[in-house]
């Protein structure tokens, strides 16, 4: 086999290893199963919990809602007249679905210029940073997955202005996140 062909095969094999997972864990309703299937998730979330104080179960519930644990998740495309692509709904990307502007702010403030939204350790650190600021600025408990999610989704100004009250669907989503966080907390107490 020629050197060029061998090099091409090696390059293709390495490229397929990728940074973030592009598929969801098999059982997203079982925190222990998720962490057994993806041990790097637990390592990243524990590091975030130690650094920022955000419990693993709160991080898991938020990531479930934002990306279903898919590292390269993006918002859907928008179409004009149902067929003409007009770009994506927002710049949200990765596990945390962080917007470009908020991600840039995080990178600047934390001096993490190499951080990537499709790497679980960077995404959980971002969430920890954001949620700890929400706790400091808005008085939201780091254990309150429901309120933390509302502040995460609406932004801290939107949360302070209670913009979520005009979005009953979002209040329902946040309540579901609160329930999922409690479910994950119960499960994690048995498998850690």
Language model segments and positions:
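Sec-dependent signal peptide recognition
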Residues: 2-10
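Residue-level signal for mature regions of secreted extracellular proteins and peptides
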Residues: 10-11, 25
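C-terminal motif of bacterial Sec signal peptides marking the signal peptidase cleavage site
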Residues: 13-16
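Catalytic glycan-binding domains that act on GlcNAc-containing polysaccharides
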Residues: 21-192
């Amino acid at each position: 086999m020629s050197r060029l062909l061998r090099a091409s095969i090696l390059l293709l094999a390495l490229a397929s290893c990728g940074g973030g997972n592009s598929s969801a864990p098999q059982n997203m309703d079982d925190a222990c199963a998720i962490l057994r299937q993806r041990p790097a998730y637990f390592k990243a979330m524990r590091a975030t919990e130690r650094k920022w104080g955000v419990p693993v179960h709160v991080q898991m519930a938020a990531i479930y809602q934002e990306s279903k644990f898919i590292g390269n998740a993006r918002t859907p495309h928008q179409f004009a007249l149902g067929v003409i692509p007009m770009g994506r709904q927002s710049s949200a990307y990765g596990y945390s679905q962080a917007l470009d502007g908020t991600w840039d702010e995080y990178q600047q403030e934390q001096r993490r210029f190499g951080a990537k939204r499709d790497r679980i350790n960077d995404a959980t650190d971002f969430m920890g940073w954001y949620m700890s600021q929400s706790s400091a600025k808005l008085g939201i408990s780091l254990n309150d997955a429901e309120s933390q999610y509302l502040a995460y989704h609406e932004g801290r100004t939107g949360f302070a202005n209670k913009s979520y009250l005009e979005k009953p669907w979002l209040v329902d989503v946040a309540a579901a996140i609160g329930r999922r966080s409690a479910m994950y907390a119960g499960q994690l107490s048995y498998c850690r």
